[in-house]
Amino acid sequence: MIRRGDVYLADLSPVQGSEQGGVRPVVIIQNDTGNKYSPTVIVAAITGRINKAKIPTHVEIEKKKYRLDKDSVILLEQIRTLDKKRLKEKLTYLSDEKMQEVDEALDISLGLHDEVKTQNT
């Protein structure tokens, strides 16, 4: 069963513009009820092209701890809904501590607790 925090290889093509594409690792960020019953999953792209997290929506993951080819960064500004058929192979699972970092970066990316939101109402 697909679970929140799982890292899979997924085929993200076709893409447009600055979207992350090709077969690459993604982390499942959808809740487990959705993962169980929906034909789709919500994921965030992972890249190995950035050595360090550059912005608050980036979360670093270490290759040794998570059995990846290289140190990588989860891009929480690159969120996509995929059909489960795009998921190829489960690579690893992120720790609860790392998922807490993912949640914090998601909060920033989606502006869930953004003070600007309350000022505009």
Swiss-Prot record:
Gene3D superfamilies hit by this protein: 2.30.30.110
Keywords from the UniProt entry: Endonuclease, Hydrolase, Nuclease, RNA-binding, Toxin-antitoxin system
Keyword Iron: no
Gene Ontology biological process terms in this record: mRNA catabolic process; rRNA catabolic process
Broad enzyme group: hydrolase
E.C. numbers: 3.1.-.-
Subunit comment: Forms a complex with MazE which is no longer active as an endoribonuclease.
Purpose: Toxic component of a type II toxin-antitoxin (TA) system. Ribosome-independent, sequence-specific endoribonuclease that cleaves mRNA, thus inhibiting protein synthesis and inducing bacterial stasis. It cuts between the first and nucleotides of 5'-UACAU-3' in single-stranded RNA. Neutralized by coexpression with cognate antitoxin MazE.
Record protein name field: Endoribonuclease MazF
Organism encoding this protein: Staphylococcus haemolyticus (strain JCSC1435)
Gene assigned in the entry: mazF
